[in-house]
Design a protein with these regions (language model features):
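Active-site gating/interface segments in enzymes
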Residues: 1-140
Length: 140
């Protein structure tokens, strides 16, 4: 993302799930040009490792050449929350379904940024959500 003029706003959220022998990389960069005063820019990358052999390399970057801006970035890499799994299992949800629900809830905030009525061919928000859930269930 390159902000070249003032009073810009951007919010980037990237959530990733890595399983098996996956090697994932996130190399984000936001540039704020000298004339882009009063810009607000945020970048975040969150990842969940679903196996002991999956790896994620996350490098968010900010290049700021203006002095009146509000910018931040962040990255996390972790595993599924065992306390949440225990809670769901204690209420009768099978372990695999609990993991699926955790993964779906992890990616849901990103899916919700797609406008409800957005369509690009067959890629409406419900169609994308269905594809994501199907993919999650295939490797859970």
């Amino acid at each position: 993302m390159h902000h070249r003029t003032g009073d810009c706003r951007s919010w980037q959220t990237f959530n990733g799930l890595a399983t098996g022998e996956a090697r994932c990389g996130f190399f984000g960069k936001i540039v704020i040009a000298p004339d882009a005063q009063r810009t607000e820019a945020f970048q975040e990358n969150h990842n969940i490792l679903l196996s002991d052999t999956a790896r994620v390399n996350s490098k968010p970057r900010l290049e700021i050449y203006a002095d009146d801006v509000k910018c931040s970035h962040g990255a996390t890499v972790g595993k599924l929350n065992e306390d949440e799994q225990f809670y769901m299992r204690s209420r009768g949800i099978p372990e695999e379904e609990a993991k699926v629900l955790q993964m779906i809830s992890f990616v849901a905030p990103v899916l919700e940024t797609i406008p409800e009525d957005a369509t690009d061919g067959d890629l409406s928000r419900p169609a994308i959500a269905e594809l994501v859930e199907s993919a999650i269930r295939s490797f859970a």
